[in-house]
Amino acid sequence: MSTLRLLISDSYDPWFNLAVEECIFRQMPATQRVLFLWRNADTVVIGRAQNPWKECNTRRMEEDNVRLARRSSGGGAVFHDLGNTCFTFMAGKPEYDKTISTSIVLNALNALGVSAEASGRNDLVVKTVEGDRKVSGSAYRETKDRGFHHGTLLLNADLSRLANYLNPDKKKLAAKGITSVRSRVTNLTELLPGITHEQVCEAITEAFFAHYGERVEAEIISPNKTPDLPNFAETFARQSSWEWNFGQAPAFSHLLDERFTWGGVELHFDVEKGHITRAQVFTDSLNPAPLEALAGRLQGCLYRADMLQQECEALLVDFPEQEKELRELSAWMAGAVR
């Protein structure tokens, strides 16, 4: 029986693909070496310890239907589109060695005619006339008896969109957590015009087989049926949940301020695990009562635009004469935390 396993996903859903990755990683025999190839439609993928409100322009992502996905490994935020090829290498210990998987990717690039080299802890770079340019970034995860190395290769990604989504709004946000370090990047199509996802996958697969001296048939993961993987439904539900993608953010504070025709408002939020643990409201409004009531209602509320709107609009029952002010406040708050 072969010790290798090759899986290729036809899904572009980041939550689906990360759930597949997690299920395989949890249930694989310690003697197995796995290669999983995949790609995602428009998504910002953040590291396990990152704060999406700090790392991303969450409002623009929502407007453009860009998903947020938190992975189980560390590292920084990256933008995925169909111009990225994603790879995951898994192995039990002591077989797991990220230098082996890195060399497999370098060999694959070399076979395609691209001379690249490892740089720093987790990047692959190519030399250009403008200097070194990153074409691949990776992250890693290890448990007691196994580990994985996953990463992306930039084929023909829309690099302009990185800046759109990976630069957060200039919010007054004091946040803990890992901050991404931006690198200068380039696409492989600059070096190999016309290179495709399928060609890159084939090159990585051949380098994987060559390293281990074995070949196996690829298992195709279809988006049209639930994968036959233990606990997939539960894993997918968690991976796609707001509680995991947003609620796992490290504790942070958020200061919002705005001036309306009826007065200025300053909101101070402390947020832990996606819930507001403390809310303070300051205002020079001539009628501060609804705002004082709002501060009490927001304590314990999910830090989510629709929930903030719901709590604000619930005050219309008690303060019908301030309907205009409350609706303006509700719309502003929702926009500010997206």
Swiss-Prot record:
pH dependence of function: Most active from pH 5.5 to 8.0. Inactive below pH 4.3.
Keywords for this protein: ATP-binding, Cytoplasm, Ligase, Nucleotide-binding
Boundaries of every BPL/LPL catalytic domain copy: 29-216
NCBIfam families: lipoyltrans (TIGR00545)
Nucleotide-binding found in the keyword field: yes
Similarity comment text for this entry: Belongs to the LplA family.
Function: Catalyzes both the ATP-dependent activation of exogenously supplied lipoate to lipoyl-AMP and the transfer of the activated lipoyl onto the lipoyl domains of lipoate-dependent enzymes. Is also able to catalyze very poorly the transfer of lipoyl and octanoyl moiety from their acyl carrier protein.
Note: In the transfer reaction, the free carboxyl group of lipoic acid is attached via an amide linkage to the epsilon-amino group of a specific lysine residue of lipoyl domains of lipoate-dependent enzymes.
Organism whose genome encodes this protein: Escherichia coli (strain K12)
Gene Ontology CC terms: cytoplasm; cytosol
PANTHER family per the UniProt record, alphabetical: LIPOATE-PROTEIN LIGASE, LIPOYLTRANSFERASE 1, MITOCHONDRIAL
Pfam families in alphabetical order: Lip_prot_lig_C (PF10437), LplA-B_cat (PF21948)
Catalyzed reaction equations: L-lysyl-[lipoyl-carrier protein] + (R)-lipoate + ATP = N(6)-[(R)-lipoyl]-L-lysyl-[lipoyl-carrier protein] + AMP + diphosphate + H(+)
EC number, UniProt record: 6.3.1.20
Binding site for (R)-lipoate: 134
Activity regulation, short description: 6-seleno-octanoate, 8-thio-octanoate and 8-seleno-octanoate caused 100%, 50% and 63% inhibition respectively. Inhibited by Cu(2+).
Binding site for ATP: 71, 76-79, 134
Protein name, as recorded: Lipoate-protein ligase A
Major site of localization recorded for this protein: cytoplasm
GO MF annotation, one: ATP binding
Enzyme category, top tier: ligase
Pathway: Protein modification; protein lipoylation via exogenous pathway; protein N(6)-(lipoyl)lysine from lipoate: step 1/2; Protein modification; protein lipoylation via exogenous pathway; protein N(6)-(lipoyl)lysine from lipoate: step 2/2
Gene3D superfamilies xref list: Bira Bifunctional Protein, Domain 2, CO dehydrogenase flavoprotein, C-terminal domain
Subunit structure: Monomer.
Source superkingdom: Bacteria
CDD domains named in the record: BPL_LplA_LipB
Signal peptide coordinates: none
